[in-house]
Amino acid sequence: MGKVVGIDLGTTNSEVAVMQGGEPVVIPSAEGSTLIPSVVAINKNGERIVGRQAKNQAILNPENTVYSIKRFMGRKWGEPAGRELPVEADAKRKPYKVIQGNNNEVRVVMGDKDFSPPEVSAMILQKLKSDAEAYLGEKVTEAVITVPAYFNDAQRQATKDAGAIAGLKVLRIINEPTAAALAYGLDKKKDETIAVYDLGGGTFDISILELGEGTFQVKSTAGDTHLGGDDFDQKIIDWLIAEYKKDQGIDLSKDKTALQRLKEAAEKAKIELSTVQQTEINLPFITADASGPKHLNIILTRSKLEQMVMDLVEKSLEPCRQALKDSGKTSAEINEVILVGGQTRMPLVQQKVKDFFGKEPNKGVNPDEVVAIGAAIQAGVLKGEVSDVLLLDVIPLTLGIETLGGVSTALITRNTTIPTSKSQVFSTAADNQPSVEIHVLQGERPMAADNRTLGRFMLDGILPAPRGVPQIEVTFDIDANGMLSVKAKDKGTGREQKITITASSGLSKEEVEKMTREAEAHAVEDTKRKEEIEARNVADNLAYNAEKTLRDNKDKIPAELNTELESKIAAVRTALQGNDVEAIKKTTQELSTALQSVGSAVYGKQQEGAPAQEEPSAEGKKADDEGTVEGEFREV
């Protein structure tokens, strides 16, 4: 039975963890870090790169480097934004191109192709999958993936689609704050009520949970899927653009390369200001005009940054109030406040959380790793590796249907424990109505038009009758992933129609399967490319060492071997000029064999010319070499 990994698919960074020996372990990437930037790029050679490599080349390739793709997951152009920034406005902030696809889907452009957000997320998941396989030494095909608690149905489905495209069977979608609570509370024996304040790179969640005897029960959750570290960075970027325009009269917002440099500088300055009082933002050659190159050099203080982002921190407290109210708890009843997400390292955030809850936040967990660890624990629960853990999560948003007058009628209210099922009987609005449309909605607004459409389907074949007579039973079923299926049944005829809300990510089953095949093909290409690079590196190093051997030992190498070695080196250099990996491997092997022959010949020659050594006497006296000191050799 293969390992099931836990994945924190983040806006800024992602992580993968696994249970080993009964303990969760965060897996390092091929580059050696447990934090993998959620960045994907296509470079000038048309190669796809993911993670640290992609982030490192972003300044030189801003238009083909995609980051913060999580903010576009499950979103559509022109949809009601709620607390979120409309897609159109968010797209304008990005140096890469975001376009409108079929059915108002969001697409991002890299190279000469456009991709859906689940496809881009799948590339990040493939990187995590590959790193996990290299670490574990076995194939990884199953995963538990975390999402913000406040993700709606479409965003959750988009995440499942991303997993499928990456070749992963997603056993469970788990809320990020719940995962953090699992990691925090797994070894806790006493009953506690905790608040998980999760401010990540792109999203904010607050969850109130009761912990006790291995049971983790979510009492309420609230949040904002468009509030996170990205927004803090954007405040600094906007300030830098305004200051530079005021000082130099140049608008850097029109320059995509400059924007990418500003983003990296803003993120760096923000991180530094968590530990120091001021930092210098120095960007030489940021732009140029008729007078020549221009530089940017500005001092940013912690107090100035706090003034800039105060509204964002305050914005996070409104969902906290909502979550406390929904849970029926007061801040005094919260035993611990757990901080999750890199943005919670900011002193202002910690102070505001302390002021709100009236207690010092718990800093005993790693805010970057705790979600992935919780996902790995949940994976262990599903596989039977972790016992005596019961997780009771909730739905974040109310689910209902549209009824007469465009009203949204709730069937399952927010913060209902899942899995769950709820039925309600409705009737027709007109005499002899032959069919009804079931319009499935998600959201808290009283009118259907202001909520998100999850799906529509028709129930036909209703027998002619006066309005209000037919009885149509509508049933909502939600599984443990928070995924919804809806059934409508005419109680008079027994006729029923069912819809599972699976295409709300904007991708059909066929599209997901096609993308999966493409992703698999790319994985094969990536493996071949890696194999070629490794073969080239081995060949180049061997040729270099062979050339050095020739230079250093020319007088000691027999003439015929000298000629053979030169010939083999030339063959390797010629093979390296082309793209035939097998030719590179073949010539490398031949050169290696030739080098071994040279080594044998040189050492053989040295031994022939060496004087015979006398045996030491029984008394242990030294022979001819007076510089030799006797001593014992002891293995340690």
From Swiss-Prot:
Native organism taxonomy:
Bacteria, Bacillati, Chloroflexota, Dehalococcoidia, Dehalococcoidales
What's the stated role of this polypeptide? Acts as a chaperone.
Protein family: Belongs to the heat shock protein 70 family.
Output this protein's name: Chaperone protein DnaK
Q: What induces it?
A: By stress conditions e.g. heat shock.
Region ranges (Disordered): 602-636
Regions of compositional bias (Basic and acidic residues) in chain numbering: 618-636
Q: Which NCBIfam families match?
A: PRK00290.1 (NF001413), PRK05183.1 (NF003520), prok_dnaK (TIGR02350)
| Record-linked Pfam families | HSP70
Q: Which Gene3D superfamilies match?
A: 1.20.1270.10, 3.30.420.40, Actin, Chain A, domain 4, Substrate Binding Domain Of DNAk, Chain A, domain 1
Record bears the keyword Phosphoprotein:
yes
Tell me the PROSITE patterns matching this sequence. HSP70_1 (PS00297), HSP70_2 (PS00329), HSP70_3 (PS01036)
Keywords noted in UniProt: ATP-binding, Chaperone, Nucleotide-binding, Phosphoprotein, Stress response
**Record's InterPro entries?**
ATPase_NBD, Chaperone_DnaK, Heat_shock_70_CS, HSP70_C_sf, HSP70_peptide-bd_sf, Hsp_70_fam
Q: Does the keyword ATP-binding apply?
A: yes
Q: Which organism is it from?
A: Dehalococcoides mccartyi (strain CBDB1)
The PTM Phosphothreonine maps to T203
Q: Which GO terms describe its molecular function?
A: ATP binding; ATP-dependent protein folding chaperone; unfolded protein binding
Top-level taxon: Bacteria
